[in-house]
Amino acid sequence: MKIPTSLPLWSVVSPIVAWLLLAGSALGMGEVVGGFYTLLLVAGLFAGVLAAVFHAEVVAHRVGEPYGTLVLAVAVTAIEVALIVSLMLAGGAETTGLARDTVFAAVMIILNGMVGLCLLAGGSRHGEQTFGQYGVSASLATLAAIAILTLVLPNYTTTTPGPAYSSSQLAFIAVVSLVLYGTFVLVQTVRHRDYFLPEASVSDEEVHAAPPPTRLAWFSAAWLLACLGGVVLLAKMLAPTLEAAVVGAGAPKALVGIIIATVVLLPEGIAAYQAARANRLQTSLNLALGSALASIGLTIPAVAIVSLATGWTLSLGIDIKSTVLLLLSIIVATLSLGTGRTTVMQGTVHLVIFAVYLFTTIVP
């Protein structure tokens, strides 16, 4: 979309309304108003998501690629990490598998749902789309390494029984995750920034339009954080209602984590979808794969610190079914994104894997 020199009123008001709804809920308005207040919370949630996407576009257009996509990925992940850590500290040892479930859901949603939808949307509108193969290959290699080391390898170590690392192993893997993600960010933003830039031939008014003023970009950055914070907290507040609905429908509780992860990732997902529709697939893939890398590369070290500080055993290893789906997703992503050209075929394959993931979660 074209970035204006001033912000529309709805993008400024939406996060304020979201935080007012949160304050009202804390003061007991939900008990007074009843079910209607839940509908207001849902409306506030989606308004916050749309506002976050808009402000992210403003910031991204100001700082340019690939910094703009990195801003949104790190901002969402930082708030996601804070939410997971706070839930772990509040829930105690019973929540030691929360980080694993959240990270795995995020990786599967991004690698199959988000990427698949972007490839399908872009391919259906523009036919064949192209992107920089070197940047995407670097993203996939880093993601595969971190995902296998953190979610699969714990099942096969022998120092500690169960799907967990020992204290020394956990500390080592946390450092390894930070090294891999830090190196990726260095390559993306400094050493080989050109690998992640959109093709110069792309003709889009948003790419060539003048960037917004610095003051407007700083305001949007602050409002972006406010939007993301409101989205995460509203999702957390709606979780009990959502869980009751899922249980009432006879579905497994694991579906709740998938739905919450989807809501938290909506700002990045919508931004990536819009970029793919505008024939900027490089930007779309930067958003999607960068989000997955930030999610797993920053969350695991953070929860490892909590685990080491509290003495809780952190469950990281996923089960056999999840391992098969994760490996399938990585292999398919490597093949479908390995040529630098995509069509609706690749998008359909990713979405089918995502559908299988959802179905086997509901019907294990």
Annotated model-derived regions:
Residues 1-364:
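Hydrophobic alpha-helical segments, chiefly the membrane-spanning helices
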